[in-house]
Amino acid sequence: MPRFAANLSMMFQEVGFLDRFDAAARAGFKAVEFLFPYEHPPETIAERLEKNRLTLALFNTVPGDWAGGERGLAAQPGRDQEFRDGVDKAILYAKASKCRLLHTMAGLWPAGRDKEAGERIYIDNLRWAADRMAAAGLTAVIEPINTRDIPGYFLNYTGEAMRIIERVGRPNLKLQFDLYHVQIMEGDLATKVRTLAGHYPHVQIAGNPGRHEPDVGEIHYPYLFDLFDEIGYQGWIGCEYRPKGDTLAGLGWAKTYGIG
């Protein structure tokens, strides 16, 4: 049976961030994920997880100036030291919270700029990050993101991601498989679930269009959940969606799985 992680950056907006751990646990979730924990000390995050017996499945390394529009540093020229400092900070949080996966965001890449130059930066930084994380027993993941939600994002397709992973050549660099983004950019989700099996330690879901609950829109998730079971997927499935209304009221899709 699939295992679901509540995304606390999007779900349970009815309460403040630190109270969302309690809310997720009360709803029946056994794990959580979120974008960034850095507004709170690592000890505070760890305490909330332990109190609610929650696993932290995934979070992102420091993305640069998120409020100012930046969306990662790994493929950004002249930002190597800032990127590395951010990775080290993320590792501290991961150790405190016993999280094993860190998403390393590439950032934006202006149209017309030589993308091969960005790819060289990206590969060098990912090698450094993967080695740093390996020393801490962690796995790095990269995620193709659709061009509608984040125009100009450096990495958009699973094929691109797999080519980058191959070029980096580190066993602890894997694919973050977000079905919402892949549906928008590529489709053919069931085939990709099978062909990419073994390369993704983390999956994320949302309905399309709208990025709401997974039972809203064109994607038939029950079929895909059964397919994950069929191929023996053991990782978490992150619920990275924006509830259309009250979070709990929108969990009808999850009752089959003991949530809501």
Could you tell me what each predicted segment is?
Residues 29, 54, 138, 233:
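Short phosphate-binding/catalytic loops that engage adenosine nucleotides
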Residues 73-174:
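Active-site acidic/histidine proton-transfer and metal-coordination neighborhood
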Residues 1-9, 58-73, 106-110, 145:
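N-terminal small/glycine-rich loop or linker at the start of catalytic domains
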Residues 33, 57-60, 103, 141, ...:
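Conserved beta-strand positions in the central sheet of alpha/beta enzyme cores
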Residues 1-28, 38, 89, 98-100, ...:
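Histidine-acidic metal/acid-base catalytic patches
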Residues 33-52, 60, 106-114, 149, ...:
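Glycine-rich, proline-tolerant flexible connector loops at the mouths of alpha/beta enzymes
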Residues 38-56, 86-97, 123-134, 190-195:
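Short amphipathic alpha-helices and their capping/turn segments at secondary-structure boundaries
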Residues 43-47, 69-72, 114-117, 153-155, ...:
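Short secondary-structure transition/capping segments
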